[in-house]
From Swiss-Prot:
PROSITE patterns named among the record's database cross-references: RNA_POL_BETA
Protein name: DNA-directed RNA polymerase subunit beta
Nucleotidyltransferase recorded as keyword: yes
Additional notes on this entry: A second beta-like protein with a slightly lower molecular weight has been purified with the PEP-A polymerase as identified by mass spectrometry.
Role: DNA-dependent RNA polymerase catalyzes the transcription of DNA into RNA using the four ribonucleoside triphosphates as substrates.
Listed EC numbers: 2.7.7.6
Localization of this protein: Plastid, Chloroplast
Source superkingdom: Eukaryota
Gene3D superfamilies linked: 2.40.50.100, 2.40.50.150, 3.90.1100.10, DNA-directed RNA polymerase, beta subunit, external 1 domain (2.30.150.10), DNA-directed RNA polymerase, subunit 2, domain 6 (2.40.270.10), RNA polymerase alpha subunit dimerisation domain (3.90.1800.10), RNA polymerase Rpb2, domain 2 (3.90.1110.10)
Length: 1078
């Protein structure tokens, strides 16, 4: 936990701890279990049969969730769901004799949340992300029409996202728009909702305006409720003629209009009461005539210049749809399906004169399948990204504008994507995705939490003057509350108590940023990085970087691969420990005790009169193929305290996040090998296993029962060389510990097939006729190791489902570990958006070296710094060098300039000066060019002309590795329509020669290469076949005569538009045209 003392200028102000990073997910799931379940179960209606003799009902007070029988780890390996069974008491009541049969019944499984804040569904870790939606309520806006006149509208948004728009025209008539083309008078709508004219005029502030557009025709329409409903129905459903009033017409209108557009919900009722100054009870969640009339009054006031317009992008007008809301919606859907099942079962039982027991009326299928399909297919339920510990923890804190009821990447405008002042302390202004979803997927700030009404709350210190002594208390404010306070920014200069009265501070008030006197401040921020997300808070010296580069850095830290030997960063921000702890990657002691035994698989701890065995994760594959592994950190016999680290996980060291390595870097050009973000590295990084990582790939095969018989797993595979089968055991499955190469058989499998007599080869028929040998009719369908898959087999799993039918096949999974050193084509990055690709690996002796003889590890291009304005990397680089020489680690909170001007530079120079004195190396800090040093060319031994910045920044190796990207194709599949090669590595696709590539080839005048690209290698079917033949037998390749397939396709498409394409040959001699069809 980070202490908030000193960061705020005064040590007496108390401390503040950062909340758990998984807390948002846990609180949401707890709210669903504690409140949402009961709410939805209590809505389940009493179900009666047609004759009203039997009644079925649920007693929700006694619901019970049973602890899962399976462990999390087993659920992952066996592709099962980690869920809890839900039991509820149900009663079947006979109304004739008032007898009741009560029984505890099982109604389905609910997936549980684990300690990481995720769920395991079908063996896959999934996380539900929070969605930002427009909050239900009423919003007033004005737009200019084509004449440049302001048109005022009031939009009522329902809980379901449906909209009802009120608008006022230039004659001051008020209309309710029910569709894009249809609108009806406000009087008709109010009458249809049950008000008469007298009530309407009594409940409005401007009755004369309402009377002004009351014509005789209008009076007839609102003469009775039935007339108003008929008029409304006619306009809403666009029905011609004269419809007749009936009960079914009312029901249809209720279902299509009032339920979708007038259900406000709990939040909507509160918002409308607050906006229109009403006092309607909270349990009244539907739109009332009173609301409509108050909204119309407000709209008239707007027309006459009273009242304020609403900012739709302000966070007070948004609500967060959390895990609890999404799971509760799904439970409601499942119970509605269950209701239909129970009705059908009761009806069938009565017809057959049977009275089934209570459990037989209910099936668990609706609930179980609803949740499985939600976690499997809902856009807000995503596969947990487990590249490294940071990625796991950040994924659950995402906020998305996308998803059902939200926006799409194509329709969202710039104003929605932009940063809004109300995001301060709630949504990170930096951390968002790049590309089409920029600004639509954000990340929660560190201290933000979701309030009871679905609003995002942020904490502030309140300054209370009490007997001339300032007292501090912490408040959590929603976006609608903090508008009324002057809030001092936490990154302002530290306040000197002596001259406080004279100081002015930057502050925020009503969405504006001002500079005000200290006495006027009501609240102040509690942390300097309160408004950043976790990813952005891990960037040291972030205040010296351009925001675009900080955005790239927070995204790239999530792509860092855990290395085989992790290392703590020398320069950090102080959040690294909490990120590691909350990610659940290190093993932590649950109580104090003594270590009895430790090895790579488990740690045995004794304490509190019991012995606890803590299993460790060994070579577990994440869904990004990275290796999750725990290493014990405590010796046998050691006494430990509760909360102490027992074992480090992937990318953690001593309980701190460790994503990369501190390497010696020089910023200088080197023979053009670091042009345009390329990076030159020393071979020490390869041979020293500095950037070596382990990757685990999973290959699986299923065995089905076909119509010809079951498929067989066997080692006896005819027609295959013994070399390919060398690693199989007697069952036909690869042995643990085997080294396998591309093309090797991992699982031998034969699929039976029917063979006709005519399909046998002549020699096979001869063998059958003479010797009576039965020729094999099985087809070889083995699991082979694909290209680029070499490695060591570390695990084999044979998952046998119950009742191995064709729908429930057996699955064999083989896990292969690969050791990957860093190589040319891999991507590396710092923590300031400074990314690059390895262009060359130089021998150690050729690398530039320092004045103490040490060769540098990496050479970056200095031109990558000034134009991109990420100067933080220079501070980190120099301070890292000082830290490595002094053997110190620095944890620096951002915005340290609040203490004094140029604080970062002073800190770096003072540490370099101290390192220079302690190590007696004057080159570490040379006053003529501080931070730079003269270094030597490794090839010649001569010094370079200019002094160069050298240092030890923290550099990460990213998951974009050349082994996963490199691809070649000689021949492969073609698209059916265009007959051109497919696209993409996974489909063995080709490389596209587009329009600009054709221009380049034309520019060089390479006619033959260009013709090959457009014909043989692409979509000329006959020429392709001829090339293959002539290549085998030798000879000249024939030239393609006719047009390629894509041109034929163009001709066919033109024909479908009734356009015939012809071309003509014009004779040079007599200019006669010879017509010839294409």
């Amino acid at each position: 936990m980070i202490n908030a003392k000193k960061m705020l200028g005064d040590g007496k102000e108390g401390t503040s701890t950062i909340p758990g990073f998984n807390q948002i997910q846990f609180e949401g799931f707890y709210r669903f279990i504690d409140q949402g379940l009961i709410e939805e179960l209590s809505k389940f209606p009493k179900i009666e049969d047609i004759d009203h003799e039997i009644e079925f009902q649920l007693f929700v007070e006694t619901y019970q969730l049973v602890e899962p029988l399976i462990k999390e780890r087993d659920a992952v390996y066996e592709s099962l769901t980690y869920s809890s069974e839900l039991y509820v008491s149900a009663g079947l009541i006979w109304k004739t004799n008032r007898n009741m049969q009560e029984q505890r019944i099982f109604i389905g499984n609910i997936p549980l949340m684990n300690s990481l804040g995720t769920s395991i569904v079908n063996g896959i870790y999934r996380v539900v992300i929070n969605q930002i939606l427009q909050s239900p309520g009423i919003y007033y806006q004005s737009e200019l029409d084509h004449n440049g006149i302001s048109v005022y509208t009031g939009t009522i948004i329902s809980d379901w996202g449906g909209r009802l728009e009120l608008e006022i025209d230039k004659k001051a008539r008020i209309w309710a728009r029910v569709s894009r083309k249809q609108k009806i008078s406000i009087l008709v709508l109010s009458s249809a909702m049950g008000s008469n004219l007298r009530e309407i005029l009594e409940n409005v502030c401007y009755p004369e305006i309402f009377l002004s557009f009351l014509t005789d025709k209008e009076k007839k329409k609102i003469g009775s409720k039935e007339n108003a409903i008929l008029e409304f129905y006619q306009q809403f459903s666009c029905v011609g003629g004269d419809p007749i009033f009936s009960e079914s017409l009312c029901k249809e209108l209720q279902k299509k209009f009032f339920h979708q557009r007038c259900e406000l919900g709990r939040i909507g009722r509160r918002n409308i009461n607050w906006r229109l100054n009403l006092n309607i009870p909270q349990n009244n969640i539907f739109l009332l005539p009173r609301d409509i009339l108050a909204a119309a009054d407000h709209l008239i006031g707007m027309k006459f210049g009273m009242g304020t317009l609403d900012d739709m992008n302000h966070l007070k007008n948004k609500r967060i749809r959390s895990v609890a809301d999404l799971l509760q919606d799904q439970l409601g859907l499942a119970l509605a399906r269950l209701e239909n099942v129970v009705k059908g079962t009761i009806g069938g039982a009565i017809r057959h004169k049977l009275i089934p027991p209570t459990q037989n009326l209910v099936t668990s299928t609706p609930l179980t399948t609803t949740y499985e399909s939600f976690f499997g297919f809902h856009p807000l339920s995503q596969v947990l990204d487990r590249t490294n510990p940071l990625t796991q923890i950040v994924h659950g804190r995402k906020l998305s504008y996308l998803g059902p009821g939200g926006l799409t990447g194509r329709t969202a405008n710039f104003r929605i994507r932009d940063i809004h002042p109300s995001h301060y302390g709630r949504i990170c202004p930096i951390d968002t995705s790049e590309g089409i979803n920029v600004g639509l997927i954000g990340s929660l700030s560190i201290h933000a939490r979701i309030g009871d009404w679905g609003s995002l709350e942020s904490p502030f210190y309140e300054l209370v003057e009490k007997s001339k002594k300032a007292q501090i208390r912490m408040l959590f404010l929603s976006p609608s509350q903090d508008e009324y306070y002057m809030i001092a920014a936490g990154n302002s200069l530290a306040l000197n108590r002596g001259i406080q009265e004279e100081q002015v501070v930057p502050a925020r008030y009503r969405q504006e940023f001002l500079t005000i006197a200290w006495e006027e401040v009501h609240l102040r921020s509690i942390f300097p990085f309160q408004y950043f997300s976790i990813g952005a808070s891990l960037i040291p010296f972030i205040e010296h970087n351009d925001a675009n580069r900080a955005l790239m850095s927070s995204n790239m830290q999530r792509q860092a691969v855990p290395l085989s030997r992790s290392e703590k960063c020398i320069v950090g921000t102080g959040l690294e420990r909490q990120v590691a702890l909350d990610s659940g990657v290190p093993a932590i002691a649950e109580h104090e005790g003594k270590i009895l035994y430790t090895d790579t698989e488990k740690i045995i701890l004794s304490g509190n009169e019991n012995t606890l065995s803590i299993p460790l994760i060994m070579y577990q594959r994440s869904n990004k193929n990275t290796c999750m592994h725990q290493k014990p950190q405590v010796p046998r016999g050691k006494c430990i305290k509760k909360g102490q680290i027992l074992a480090d996980g992937a990318a953690t060291v001593g309980g701190e996040l460790a994503l990369g390595k501190n390497v010696l870097v020089a910023y200088m050009p080197w023979e053009g090998y670091n042009f345009e973000d390329a990076v030159l590295i020393s071979e020490c990084l390869v041979y020293g296993d500095i950037y070596t990582s382990f990757h685990i790939r999973k290959y699986e095969i299923q065995t089905h029962v076909t119509t010809q018989g079951p498929e067989r797993i066997t080692k006896e595979i005819p027609h295959l060389e013994g070399r390919l089968l060398r690693n199989l055991d007697k069952n036909g499955i690869v042995m643990l510990g085997s080294w396998v190469e591309t093309g090797d058989i991992l699982v031998g499998k034969l699929t039976p097939q029917v063979a006709k007599e005519s399909s046998y080869a002549p020699e096979d028929r001869l063998l059958r006729a003479i010797l009576g040998i039965q020729v094999s009719t099985s087809k070889e369908t083995c699991l082979k190791l694909p290209i680029g898959g070499r490695g060591r087999v570390i695990d084999v799993r044979w998952v046998q489902k119950k009742g191995g039918s064709s729908y429930n096949p057996e699955i064999i999974r083989v896990y292969i570990s690969q050791k990957r050193e860093i190589k040319v084509g891999d991507k590396v990055a710092g923590r300031h958006g400074n990314k690059g690709i390895i262009s060359k690996i130089l021998p150690r002796q050729d690398m530039p070296y320092l004045q103490d003889g040490r060769p540098v590890d990496m050479v970056f291009n200095p031109l990558g710094v000034p134009s991109r304005m990420n100067v933080g990397q220079i501070f980190e680089c120099s301070l890292g060098l000082a830290g490595s020489l002094l053997d110190r680690h620095y944890r620096i909170a951002p915005f340290d300039e609040r203490y004094e001007q140029e604080a970062s530079r002073k800190l770096v120079f003072s540490e370099l000066y101290e390192a220079s004195k302690q190590t007696a190396n004057p080159w570490v800090f040379e006053p003529e060019y501080p931070g730079k040093s003269r270094i030597f060319d490794g090839r010649t031994g001569d010094p370079f002309e200019q002094p160069v910045i050298i240092g030890k920044p923290y550099i990460l190796k990213l998951i974009h590795q050349v082994d996963d990207k490199i691809h070649g194709r000689s021949s492969g599949h073609y698209a059916l329509v265009t007959q051109q090669p497919l696209r993409g590595r996974s489909k063995q696709g080709g490389q596209r020669v587009g329009e600009m590539e054709v221009w380049a080839l034309e520019g060089f005048g390479v006619a033959h290469i260009l013709q090959e690209m457009l014909t043989y290698k692409s979509d000329h079917i006959r020429a392709r076949q001829e090339v293959l033949g002539t290549t085998i037998i030798g000879g000249t390749i024939p030239k393609p005569e006719d047009a390629p397939e894509s041109f034929r396709l163009l001709v066919r498409e033109l024909r479908s538009l009734a356009l015939e394409l012809n071309h003509f040959l014009v004779s040079e001699k007599n200019f006669q045209i010879n017509r010839k069809e294409v």
